[in-house]
Amino acid sequence: MCEARYLTGEPELNRYSTSRVNVLRCVALASRERRAPEWLIMQLDVYTSGMALNSGDASPSTAAPLGETTHRPRIAVVGASGYAGGETLRLLAGHPGIEVATVAAHSSAGKHLSEVAPHIDLGHDPVLAETSVDTLRGHDAVVLALPHGQSGQIAAALRAEDPEVLVLDLGADHRLESAEDWSDYYSSEHSGTWTYGMPELLLADGTRQRDQLVGAREIAVPGCNATAVSLALAPLLRAGLLDAERLSAVLPVGYSGAGRAAKQHLLFSEASGSASPYAVGGSHRHVPEVLQNLRRATGRDGQRLAFTPVLVPMSRGILAVCTAPVDEGTSTADLLAALQADYAEEHFITVLPEGVFPSTGEVAGANTLRIGAAVDHRSGQATVISALDNLVKGTAGAALQSLNLALGLPEATGLTRTALAP
């Protein structure tokens, strides 16, 4: 799938094609108008292969070969020993258009990648480097998978040295626009606001967040819970189908969302067979992020959200069960029509037919979000349910979508809609 507007912005090329002539034209225009980097021009075979695979027009056996090249963008991943960083590496290992040049960590520095993430095969077994500006200098892009509050300083130092380096923050440091919201929920100094990495979010002005990611150099990857709730509710609020002041979301979430650090309540003997609510009463840090997204999607203030996550004994996954009052006469068909209007053309979002609802098992390992909806006429409530893999579509997959857009690559390169089962 070649979305030429991502490379050039030329309206006459704003179509899908796997034609090599069209790809050449895209890159030629990008080179002339936007001064495309040399690696982009040199990687036509890689990108054409990715476009064909992503559009379903070719099989791996017929796609153009990668070939030998040293011109692929060089990527550094920081926080590789954690779940988010490890999942990012897993996806990048299958990306045909980039090179994982450096893998860094903090407490695990000095170990081989195979010691902390034996499931990841990069074709070699790198030693995890120390996390420092010196280590990260000289890359085309840096992915920061660090705990909240730890990305701001190193990101600022990297950008000060090289304004052209692309930095993606998988933590929360650069998601919120409001310094007051940041202070209320994170109790530290606000590091500023970066371009938000949720390509599918349709904004109040009719554009998508995707447009802002093309060529971006500072990207804040969304929170996993925020993605599940925001993409479920935004189309329905924009269509005026829900009571915006009485929104509720209850989210069974997998334990990987709590991170990899050893904690008593995350031990198998504590967690197995038990469901545990946490951050009850509006204290979860994704609440202001969801409300920010809903404001941007509708162009209106005043949304109120009761948000309750619940840890359940599964490794990965989020099932966001969202409810809100609806006006009498609003039907399930109305909800599904609004969702389809927003997402019918979105590669990684599936709106399910009436009477069908998603499960976390259907999205495990895939960069997909599945949504079902229904109206309960007896209670006057709408129920909208979305499911995603918190480590893929909720984190690393969203990062890779944004990385592709920022680098001028087809958005779906290196990502799959196919989940693991059972």
Place the predicted regions along the sequence by residue.
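Short, low-complexity intrinsically disordered segments enriched in A/P/G/S/L with frequent Arg
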Residues: A4, N14, R34-R35
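N-terminal Rossmann-like NAD(P) cofactor-binding subdomain of oxidoreductases
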Residues: W39-V280, R300, A374-H377, T418-P422
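Conserved active-site and cofactor/substrate-binding residues in soluble primary-metabolism enzymes
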Residues: Y83, T193, C224-L231, G281-E289, ...
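Oxyanion-binding "anion nests"
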Residues: H284-F307, L311-S315
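C-terminal active-site/capping subdomain that shapes the small-molecule cofactor and substrate pocket
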Residues: A320-P422
